[in-house]
Amino acid sequence: KILKIVGIILLVSIMLIAALLICLSMKPFVPNNYTKTVETGGELETKYLAMGTHEVKCAQAEAPGDWKKFEAFYPADLETGEDTYPVVVFANGTGVAASKYKALFRHLASWGFIVLGNEDPSTCTGASADATLAWLLECNGDPDSVFYQKADTEHIGISGHSQGGVAVFNAVSEQPHGGL
């Protein structure tokens, strides 16, 4: 009888932990309101922590294998204007897909950047970051794309979180578009 009770308690505990992990996996990694809740110590930080002046849109495309999709957040006026926009490629951390960083991507795009990410669960080689940039560069040369001649290829940056930090170094030193 005691063994049965211990078994039930163990089963319930496992189910509660599983439910908690499922709930946590559904939350964004960067809270949607982070630009309003983070406190800074200076005027410059306060200025750039706020959202920029651009409305933001998002485009997606299918990516190979585990990468699932490429995502680009961009200033909405990109679709109608003649300007080009600097690019930020973001390499996500282990098991934290780019879709968990939407608030960060929207924030950067509101300041006039094209921000790229993908769903790669293991970014360390930099290959998925490079492929995501290659996708945008292909779109930049495609007259049928919203990104046609919109990416400022002289101003491309890369950033990463956790394992994505390693991906940054590998993307710029080991991947085909590292020299950009």
List PLM regions with ranges.
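Solvent-exposed loop/turn segments at secondary-structure junctions
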Residues: 78, 93-97, 115, 120-125, ...
